[in-house]
Amino acid sequence: MINLILSAPVPEMAEAFKRVFANADNVNIVGQPFETIREFDCMVSAANSFGLMDGDVDAAITAFFGTQLQTRVQNHILREYLGEQPVGTAFVIETGDNNHPWLVHAPTMRVPLTIDGTDAVYNATWAALLAIFQHNKNATTDRKIKTVVLPAMGAGCGQVPFESVGR
């Protein structure tokens, strides 16, 4: 079983997550940016299908882990998806940071656009969880993903309301 940390730095986002996940086990809501969370071994990125990680939380991920991570994500997308990763797919990649070794890239949109009213957040989140499940099936105990930080997928550029993101 993995532990989910929902990073909700906007108070309205944190409140919406608290309502939606009030009775959920293994889910913690942190009302701060992910960079303030000390213990996690995997971060989820909801960047776009081309691996551009230069806006909203993805810009913070790139600043936190370094530009090498975006380059490696894009190279993986070139190799495995011929340059364009479909929404609803996800993969696990090493970050290069021993304290936070994994990133899941799970795009919520092909290119920056409003995705409110679509099932893109659901599909990307489900794909991220499946990628973690698949990773853990084959990983040795010391390389399993145990604690995952999940941002408010689609809430930034995608303009999905916080309550909808939580559902």
Where are these regions (language model features)?
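Macrodomain-like recognition of ADP-ribose-binding/processing modules
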Residues: 1-167
